Amino acid sequence: DIIKRIKDAIDFIDDDLVLLYGDTISNIDIDKLFQFHRLSGNEVTMSVWPLISQFGIVDIDDMGKVTGFKEKPKLDKWINIGYFYFNRSVFDAIKESSSFAELIESFSAQGILGAYKHEGIHITINTVKELSDAEKNISSIYKERK
């Protein structure tokens, strides 16, 4: 559980906290994430990536006629990709929280959570297939950074 790991370490952290999920590979520019965080005035910044449909999206009218089709489009939603910046000022809230989702929802409700939009490469590794795909594509991620 993420929140437990953070709580176990937080008393040893003297500065702000940068948190990265361990099951994600990305070509996110960390310097730009930090710069966005500093300029935004938010106490917490999460990185987000556009949600891409796994399916073709079909628009249908009342008569059942297809009026539009897009194969695996980017949707108008963003997903958390697990790169966070927490100001030290929120450490007490972290200590008091019982779940990471609850904590992030609380920061959102307080208006202190910002979103850094990353539209580059993002690979999540939650399955054996995703791991295999990541292993095949990892070199292309680092070639693009150069």
Feature names for model-found ranges:
Residues 1-60, 93:
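Conserved beta-loop-beta/alpha segment of the NTase-like Rossmann-fold superfamily
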Residues 17-18, 25, 34-38, 50-53, ...:
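Catalytic-core segments of class I nucleotidyltransferases/pyrophosphorylases
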